[in-house]
Amino acid sequence: MVIFDCNGVLVDSEALSTSIVSQEFIRAGFALTPDIVARYFTGRRPSDMFAEVEIAAGRKLPSDFALTVATATLRRFREELRATKHAAYALSWLRGPKCVASSSSHDRIRVSLEATDLIRFFEPNLFSAADVQHGKPAPDLFLHAARTMRVEPSECIVVEDSPVGVAAGVAAGMTVIGFVGGSHAGGQLGNHLRTSGAKAVISDLRALKSTIIDLRGW
């Protein structure tokens, strides 16, 4: 089975998402630039990010902050989000089981895939970190997806674009392919993904098929 992260892998959302989150932080009086959000929180659950910001700042975010961010994100995604280049091509040849496992909420996963016409490849196999106790880099989400799909972790390949996501896949006992083809990917991201445990790194989703064959012989 192939397990895909959503943001930054299937949809080119990371730059848009960090811009939205940063804007809402600044409106709430917290000076977090998009670069800071991307550097420290890419791949993390929003709830974990908000909790860490409150601890670091020594004060609470507004009580409706999570809802404000979620509402702004869904609106902008419906209007602006695009699929990662060649995502549909890469998915079209995958005949075996596949799913999405994302740190995002169920609503955001669904909106992301509907807006980019990728949901047809996955529904109903959409898994959110909201379903588990611990988000990435803990393995809980990937193990939950494998258990629900009735596939052994050792038979799973994870496609991830963040070091915390790669670490989660490795901790789950899965083979991880790093992806650096999103518009947010910096020059050192590939090295960071390898350091976190990715067995291979690709910059074009058209290379996914040959990479899986090289790693697993599928």
Protein language model regions, located:
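Active-site neighborhood of HAD-like aspartate-dependent phosphohydrolases
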Residues: M1-R39
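Asp-based, Mg2+/Mn2+-dependent phosphohydrolase catalytic module
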Residues: A88, S92, S105-W218
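Metal-dependent phosphoesterase signature
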Residues: A31, A51-Y89
